[in-house]
């Protein structure tokens, strides 16, 4: 006979079996029946605002390679979290997001803190959204949520649970299942792709974030070297999938239709692996591909394959596909290897005042530890980061997968927590714009409370520089609200419990960064910089 217990007890046993023992959230009254008598072998990561909770969990899941559990407060908490939920969805991050629903006896009367149409609210930014019809269905709903979250394309799922369900009687234990989280490509179609690649005179490889997520970094390098092919990063990368200091690396493709087409001119075949075709913004008209250029795409995401504007697609795990391509494609020894990407790295003999972003990155290139990880949300300076701080290892660069800001500060917290969880010691560097730093700023408190080894470098140019750059490109002068005077970023960081300093010179930046690496808490370094036009 199954032992009689409660829905809550059975669910926690299930979560324990699935390895879901870290909960990110901000508790509310409708969630306290779930959180009561919180198990000692679980960890609760308190975020002071729900957008921070989602981004922390997102990065934590990416680094650990395991799904993460997020507990939000009813509809209000979901509303606060939605912006960063969009990023998790686009980034294929397996999150199980939950929130409390009002008591079943009250919900018919639209009570205070009732979550009206709870399963509709997070759509379309979740793979599945469900509210169990019976209390006894809660554990099985979690099992199904887990299975859906990890299966490709991975992504967030949502459960709404009535607050009175947790203490209802139930016979345990829950049924625990395992599911596959990858699938191999169609071998016949992959062979056709391999034949086209082998016949190509001047192929280009475009690697997207799916490659790094699948553990395909080394395989991607091997394929590029066997083909002697130019390698580009897909537009708006949230994960790097190829060493950016490699001689075959040609930089990111760009963002607009015309820019991408121009970059690909001269290639007869473009092989896109683990990326969209393509993530465009802004609209600059042009040909989707140069005349005479063909394209093939390999992705684990059917929606990404269906949305491609050009080319032929193949579904399958990117790493499995690359591993098989290595055996199928012909050696490219007859091809002329592309010229290495130019890296001018020009600096003035006398430092500017205020400093320029390249001057800031030049300092960081000298002093950052080689095994450090970068979280970037300085959107107008990403091109300079690739030039001065290239990503050279798998899992060492993260950025938001959506167009919104407010992900980077809490994501750095999630990375550092994940490193601690898996016993890895490395510095986490958050490269943050001053505008971005004001979103999800509450995450600094969580970082300080956990004494995380994060160094935030905030470039204070007193404006939304990326938006001013778009205004020039899109010919939209006179847009209000693009200047940010009067921000006391360091004072604010100190208020959250971080060590924080303002610097203005390269010498000050170098010294404070070195000091931050030895500090026993999170440090925020605010650097006054010149505005610059972003490379769009």
Predicted regions and their residues:
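N-terminal alpha/beta PP-like core and its mobile active-site loop of ThDP/TPP-dependent enzymes
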Residues: 2-329, 370, 425-427, 446, ...
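Active-site diphosphate/adenylate-binding microenvironment
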Residues: 7-12, 16-21, 26-29, 34-36, ...
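A structural motif corresponding to the C-terminal end of an alpha-helix
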Residues: 125, 363-372, 493-498
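Histidine- and/or cysteine-centered catalytic micro-motif in compact active-site loops
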Residues: 208-210, 236-237, 276, 379, ...
């Amino acid at each position: 006979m199954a032992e009689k217990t409660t829905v809550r007890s059975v669910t926690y046993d299930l979560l324990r079996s699935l390895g879901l023992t870290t909960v990110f959230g901000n508790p509310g009254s409708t969630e306290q029946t779930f959180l009561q008598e919180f198990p000692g072998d679980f960890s609760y990561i308190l975020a002071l605002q729900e957008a921070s909770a989602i981004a922390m969990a997102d990065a934590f899941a990416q680094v650990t390679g395991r799904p993460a559990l997020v507990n939000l407060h009813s509809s209000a908490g979901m509303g606060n979290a939605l912006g960063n939920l969009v990023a998790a969805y686009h980034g294929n991050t397996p999150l199980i997001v939950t929130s409390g629903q009002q008591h079943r006896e009250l919900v018919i009367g639209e009570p205070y803190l009732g979550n009206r149409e709870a399963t509709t609210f997070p759509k379309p930014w979740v793979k599945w959204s469900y509210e169990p019809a019976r209390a006894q269905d809660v554990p099985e709903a979690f099992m199904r949520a887990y299975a859906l979250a990890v299966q490709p394309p991975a992504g967030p799922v949502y459960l709404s649970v009535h607050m009175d369900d947790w203490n209802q009687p139930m016979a345990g234990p829950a049924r625990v299942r395992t599911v596959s989280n990858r699938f191999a490509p169609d071998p016949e179609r992959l062979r056709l792709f391999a034949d086209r690649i082998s016949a190509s005179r001047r192929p280009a490889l475009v690697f997207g974030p799916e490659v790094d997520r699948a553990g395909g970094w080394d395989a991607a390098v091997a394929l590029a070297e066997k083909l002697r092919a130019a390698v580009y990063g897909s537009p708006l990368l949230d994960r790097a999938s190829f060493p950016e200091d490699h001689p075959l690396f040609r930089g990111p493709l760009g963002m607009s239709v015309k820019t991408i087409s121009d970059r690909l001119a001269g290639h007869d075949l473009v092989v896109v692996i683990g990326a969209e075709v393509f993530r465009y913004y802004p609209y600059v008209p042009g040909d989707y591909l140069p005349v005479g250029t063909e394209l093939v795409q390999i992705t684990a995401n059917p929606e990404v394959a269906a949305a491609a504007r050009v080319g032929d697609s193949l579904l399958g795990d990117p790493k499995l596909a690359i591993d098989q391509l290595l055996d199928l494609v012909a050696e490219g020894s007859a091809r002329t290897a592309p010229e290495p990407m130019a890296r001018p790295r020009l600096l003035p003999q006398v430092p500017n005042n205020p400093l320029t972003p390249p001057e800031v990155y030049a300092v960081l290139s000298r002093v950052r530890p080689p095994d450090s990880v970068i979280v970037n949300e300085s959107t107008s300076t990403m091109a300079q980061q690739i030039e001065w701080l290239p990503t050279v290892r798998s899992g060492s660069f993260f950025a938001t997968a959506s167009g919104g800001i407010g992900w980077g500060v809490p994501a750095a917290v999630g990375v550092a927590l994940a490193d601690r969880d898996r016993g890895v010691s490395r510095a986490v560097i958050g490269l943050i714009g001053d505008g971005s730093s004001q979103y999800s700023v509450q995450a600094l408190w969580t970082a300080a409370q956990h004494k995380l080894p994060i160094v935030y470098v905030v470039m204070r140019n007193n404006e939304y520089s990326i938006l001013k750059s778009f205004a020039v490109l899109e010919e939209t002068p006179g847009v209000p609200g693009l200047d940010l005077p009067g921000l006391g970023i360091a004072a604010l960081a100190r208020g959250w419990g971080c060590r924080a300093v303002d610097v203005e010179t390269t010498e000050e930046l170098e010294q404070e960064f070195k000091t931050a690496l030895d500090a026993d808490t999170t440090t925020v370094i605010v650097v006054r910089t010149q505005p610059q036009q972003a490379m769009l």
